[in-house]
């Protein structure tokens, strides 16, 4: 596909005035685009989210503080990634598209496929994996499903958006090879194989340029290299310089910021800073999308099959849970044995994360209310602990007595709501200590403990010896309770495999010295050694490796055949239960000239086999199997050599190995091993400035904060503001933030404001505040109070006057084209 997109609605664009063109590139409301009535260009509705529709019933707000319509809450992306099942992803996508269409939503903001650089990222539950290949394949399946229902999918957040702390005011410093191989490959697959029709740009800068203003990213890579023919949408409030965004390839600034940005666009065209051809191209792409989404569209069926979608959520959850441990085959449960169920999560499940993706579910199951549907000998159940930290000694004693008298204890525990949320990164990888204290005390009176985990990201598990079995449900959606019991009772054979590594401790992780950034820049010194690529290459022992998961049956691998364009391998179910295996293909190049991980996932297949059944699978090679990005030549190349093809049940459980010769096309190798010794060993936790500079190919940017605050500095940085009032506001915000954290429920509004740059005040207030006023606010914060107040007051009246004038121009459009 050529990168130059022919406008289908060119004649329509030619009829538009410059005021209309500039206005349509910014939102009308929080969730709607702007219509042009005289040309019959309608408004369309956008909505979160990645695992369920979050369309608000009343006035819209970015974080969902107002109630949303009921929708199916499917398991989060982090959960579904563990299924390794692209067909399941597509089926979920179809259901999401159907529900979106029923609510007149034209663009669904998801899936999220940022790379899990660190387990501490507060939004990891929304992302698929630490591996770009698996992330991209699963995202593409969602996208195909969503778009099959006439709704655009909008994968997010392009790109290198791996931390929540000051996400709108942070610069990701990353070398081009790591950018291409790790942080863009998933998006590339989503575009090329999923044919995504929209993309959301991220808040952050990439090497000093905001993602939404990065022409290299949005035009050279996205449109030219990948053939993207859709629209680029900002993250909400993520537009820094709208004119630069339009020039770079961004189509739609969200949410509404009044007409401030439109006036900037018109001024830029008139003074030559923005080519009118670029403006027309962005408008044409957006109008093409709007008309495609609305032309010939029938009235939506306001109903969807709630029960069918609930059952799909149940199936998806069951297929995505990971059995991490099963000593002495304690699972599936013996129905004759007495069972005690302990844990707050058994009564109030944690089935989704917090933030803009939060869904108002059609129904929610909890284990306590559906137990009667299963043939189990339940001795009793109680909380034993409270996830908010409240202590009830009587309940705790009852839990211990109950455990003492039961044959088996099912202990439900995990991360609480404050641990994982948009806008907030974790500070450690531990489960709350009160839960672990109770688990350890129970283990002293009953050795038959089955741990049921709820968490959206990797955790430390020093307590795992207390459990005879561990079933990890992740955040498994509204039907997670029945899915859990289906596995515990043997109705479903677990087939989930970890889509991320579980290290023994946080200090083992490759980026732990660099994450999260507390300065202006976040330095990606670990390069391509993210997740298993690091642990496997540097021989770091982990708790559970990438791709790991147990089953109630056993599988053997045999007869590996390596062909020019792929492999064939036979898999046999040697157990006495039907089950599914995830066959994983890794590729490595021993003694490579260009440093690289020891092995990388390059293909996988999930196969369902009856007891005793054997089947031959084929996993193809593709354009990503042997490639690396050569920073010297600026292109994808293949290094000549004998590649290892490794097939197994996890990155650490390789069953079959073979070799294949490949003739490369490298035109000069990019690195000097003598200057990059640690990158060649994979031991990247303490990369020196000299070695990182060699990797980047240029000086390391100065990431220190300057004395004066600027419009792109975060509001939470007012702790060193010169203005006493600003410091007081900072203390008040911090107090409110800490109060919500102490209560166990994050205040999303406070978190968003806390990490928002000053310019966000103009971008998130619907036109009430202009950028002129923001500059005044910053002047006041920096100690120039009277100057700042003058700009704010004067700017307020000028903004009102100019907005009214712009409205009149739009209403009077259609006469002489300006």
Describe the residue ranges of each PLM region.
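Terminal connector regions
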Residues: 623-670
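Charged, amphipathic alpha-helical linkers/stalks
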Residues: 651-652, 658-729
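Glycoside hydrolase catalytic-domain context in secreted enzymes
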Residues: 1-624, 642-647, 651, 756, ...
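Long, low-hydrophobicity ectodomains and other hydrophilic envelope-associated domains
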Residues: 694-818
């Amino acid at each position: 596909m050529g990168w130059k997109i022919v406008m289908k609605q060119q004649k329509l664009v030619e009829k538009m005035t410059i005021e209309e063109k500039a206005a349509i590139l910014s939102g009308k409301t929080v969730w709607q685009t702007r219509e042009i009535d005289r040309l019959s260009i309608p408004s369309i509705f956008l909505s979160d989210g990645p695992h369920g529709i979050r369309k608000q019933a009343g006035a819209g707000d970015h974080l969902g503080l107002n109630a949303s319509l009921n929708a199916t809450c499917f398991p989060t992306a982090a959960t579904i990634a563990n299924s390794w099942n692209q067909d399941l992803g597509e089926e979920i996508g179809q259901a999401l598209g159907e529900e979106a269409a029923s609510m007149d939503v034209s663009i669904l903001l998801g899936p999220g496929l940022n790379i899990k650089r660190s387990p501490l990222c507060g939004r990891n539950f929304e992302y698929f994996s630490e591996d770009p290949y698996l992330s991209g394949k699963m995202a593409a399946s969602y996208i195909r499903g969503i778009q099959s229902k006439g709704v655009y999918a909008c994968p997010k957040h392009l790109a290198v958006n791996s931390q929540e702390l000051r996400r709108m005011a942070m610069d990701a410093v990353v070398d081009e090879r790591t950018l291409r191989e790790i942080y863009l490959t998933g998006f590339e697959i989503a575009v090329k194989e999923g044919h995504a029709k929209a993309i959301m740009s991220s808040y952050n800068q990439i090497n000093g340029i905001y993602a939404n203003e990065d022409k290299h990213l949005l035009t050279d890579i996205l449109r030219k290299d990948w053939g993207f023919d859709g629209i680029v949408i900002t993250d909400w409030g993520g537009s820094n310089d709208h004119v630069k965004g339009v020039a770079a390839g961004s189509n739609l600034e969200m949410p509404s910021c009044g007409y401030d940005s439109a006036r900037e666009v018109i001024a830029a065209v008139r003074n030559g800073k923005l080519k009118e051809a670029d403006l027309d191209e962005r408008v044409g792409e957006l109008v093409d999308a709007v008309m495609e989404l609305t032309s010939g569209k029938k009235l939506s069926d306001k109903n969807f099959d709630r029960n069918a979608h609930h059952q799909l959520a149940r199936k998806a959850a069951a297929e995505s849970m990971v059995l991490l441990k099963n000593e002495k085959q304690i699972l599936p449960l013996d129905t004759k044995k007495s069972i005690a169920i302990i844990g707050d999560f058994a009564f109030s499940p944690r089935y989704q994360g917090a933030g803009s993706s939060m869904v108002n579910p059609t129904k929610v199951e909890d284990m306590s209310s559906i137990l009667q549907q299963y043939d189990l000998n339940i001795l009793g159940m109680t909380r034993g602990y409270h996830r908010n930290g409240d202590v009830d000694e009587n309940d705790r004693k009852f839990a211990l007595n109950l455990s003492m008298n039961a044959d088996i204890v099912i202990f439900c525990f995990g991360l609480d709501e404050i641990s994982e949320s948009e806008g907030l990164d974790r500070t450690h990888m531990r489960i709350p200590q009160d839960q672990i204290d109770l688990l350890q005390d129970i283990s002293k009176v009953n050795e038959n403990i089955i741990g049921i985990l709820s968490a959206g990201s990797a955790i430390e598990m020093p307590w795992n010896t207390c459990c005879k079995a561990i079933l990890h449900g992740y955040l498994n959606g509204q039907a997670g309770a029945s899915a859990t019991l289906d596995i515990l009772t043997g109705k479903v054979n677990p087939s989930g495999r970890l889509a991320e590594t579980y290290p023994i401790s946080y200090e083992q992780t490759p980026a732990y010295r660099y994450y999260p950034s507390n300065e202006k820049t976040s330095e990606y010194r670990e390069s391509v050694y993210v997740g298993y690529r690091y642990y496997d290459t540097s021989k770091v022992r982990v708790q559970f490796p990438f791709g790991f998961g147990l089953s109630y049956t056993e599988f053997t691998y045999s007869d590996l055949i390596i062909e020019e364009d792929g492999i064939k391998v036979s898999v046999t179910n040697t157990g006495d239960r039907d089950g599914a295996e995830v066959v994983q293909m890794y590729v490595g190049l021993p003694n490579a000239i260009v440093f690289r991980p020891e092995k990388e996932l390059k293909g996988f297949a999930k196969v369902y086999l009856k007891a005793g059944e054997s089947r031959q699978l084929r996993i193809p090679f593709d354009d990503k199997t042997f490639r690396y990005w050569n920073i010297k030549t600026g292109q994808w190349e293949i290094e000549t050599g004998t590649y290892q093809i490794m097939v197994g049940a996890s990155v650490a459980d390789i069953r079959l190995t073979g070799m294949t010769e490949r003739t490369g096309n490298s035109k000069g190798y990019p690195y000097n091993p003598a200057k990059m010794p640690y990158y060649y060993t994979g031991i990247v936790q303490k990369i020196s400035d000299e070695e990182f500079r060699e990797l980047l190919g240029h000086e390391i940017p100065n990431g220190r904060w300057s004395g004066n605050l600027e419009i792109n500095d975060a509001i939470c940085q007012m702790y060193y503001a010169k203005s006493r009032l600003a410091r007081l506001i900072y203390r008040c915000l911090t107090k409110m933030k800490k109060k919500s954290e102490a209560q166990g429920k994050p205040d999303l509004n406070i978190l968003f404001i806390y990490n928002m740059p000053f310019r966000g005040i103009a971008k998130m207030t619907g036109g009430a505040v202009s950028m002129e006023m923001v500059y005044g606010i910053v002047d006041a914060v920096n100690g120039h109070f009277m100057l700042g107040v003058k700009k704010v007051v004067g700017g307020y009246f000028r903004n009102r006057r100019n907005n009214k004038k712009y409205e009149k121009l739009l209403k009077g459009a259609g006469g002489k084209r300006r």
